[in-house]
Amino acid sequence: MASQNRILVLGPTGAIGRHVVWASIKAGNPTYALIRKTPGDINKPSLVAAANPESKEELLQSFKAAGVILLEGDMNDHEALVKAIKQVDTVICTFGRLLILDQVKIIKAIKEAGNVKRFFPSEFGLDVDRHDAVDPVRPVFDEKASIRRVVEAEGVPYTYLCCHAFTGYFLRNLAQFDATEPPRDKVIILGDGNVKGAYVTEADVGTYTIRAANDPRTLNKAVHIRLPHNYLTSNEVVSLWEKKIGKTLEKSYISEEKVLKDINVSTFPHNYLLALYHSQQIKGDAVYEIDPAKDAEAYDLYPDVKYTTADEYLDQFV
C-alpha cells in the first residue's frame, strides 16, 4: 500500500523535486526530504526557475507543516546519506544537470544501506537511451545514460521516468526565447512544425512519478509520459493558441541548418534551450516505439489521472 512505501526525495526544493514531494504527501506516502547541510552555489547558472513563488525557507516550512520529515545531509557525507536511506523504501533523485554524476555516491550509499526497494535516478526528460541530441545537451544525456548503466551493473532496483518537455520550458512561451507567455503577433517554429512532441506540467510529473513509485509494474522499467492530449506538433500547439486568442500568428519556420548554427554561436542558457528544442521539435526524440519488456506508457498504466492538457494549460495566458 502507498502508506507503507516510505519515499525520500533528493533535491526536494528544485523545480521538479518540490512537485514530487507534494505528490508523495498527497498520495499518503511517509515522505522524507534530504536538505543540504551547506547552501548550494547561488551563482551557478540556472536554466529555468521553479514555477512557484516560495523561497526555499518558505517551502521547507510548508513541507514541515504538511508532515514531510526533513533530514540533513548531502552527497559528500556518506554516513549521513546511508543513515537517511536506511529510513526509507524508495529514493527519488531530482538533481539538476550539474549534479548528475554525483548520483554514483547515492548508488554507493543505497548498496551499503541494503534496504532500498526502488531508485529513481534523476532523469525527468527525454529517454537518454533514445535520442539524437547535439551539444551542449548531449553530454548531459550521456551522463544520465552512464548513471543508468551503473544502476543496472550494481543490481539496484530502479524506475526511469521519461517525461520529455516540461510546460515551463516549452509551452508557456511556445518555445520563444526571452518571452514569459505565448506570442500574440509572430511565432518562430523550428523545422517544419510537424514533428510530435510530448508536453507535461511539472505538477503532473510529480503525480506520475509517485504513481510509478507505488506500482510494482514499473520495477526495472522506463516509464514514458506521452499523454494523448499533450502529444502534439509545434503547428498543433500554435493552432491551439490561435484559437484561444482568435488570431492567426505570422509564422517563421527555421531550418535545422540555421538552428544548429544558432546553437553553436549562442551562449548559455540560449544554446542549451535551443538544443532541447532541436531535440524534440526537429529530431523527434519523443517519437519512438516502446518495448513492453522494459518500458511502459504512463497513460496506459494510470488512465485515471486527470492531467493538465496543453489546451487547458494555455488558458491561463489568454
UniProtKB/Swiss-Prot annotation:
Disulfide bonds: none annotated. GO terms for biological process: lignan biosynthetic process. NADP(+) binds at G11, P12, T13, G14, A15, I16, G17, R36, K44, R148. It catalyses: (3R)-vestitone + NADP(+) = 2'-hydroxyformononetin + NADPH + 2 H(+). It comes from the Eukaryota. Belongs to the NmrA-type oxidoreductase family. Isoflavone reductase subfamily. Reduces achiral isoflavones to chiral isoflavanones during the biosynthesis of chiral pterocarpan phytoalexins. The gene is IFR. One of its GO terms (molecular function) is 2'-hydroxyisoflavone reductase activity. Pathway: Phytoalexin biosynthesis; pterocarpan phytoalexin biosynthesis. It is an enzyme of class 1 (oxidoreductase). Keywords: NADP, Oxidoreductase. Its EC number is 1.3.1.45. CDD domains: PCBER_SDR_a. The active site is at K144 (proton acceptor). This is Isoflavone reductase.
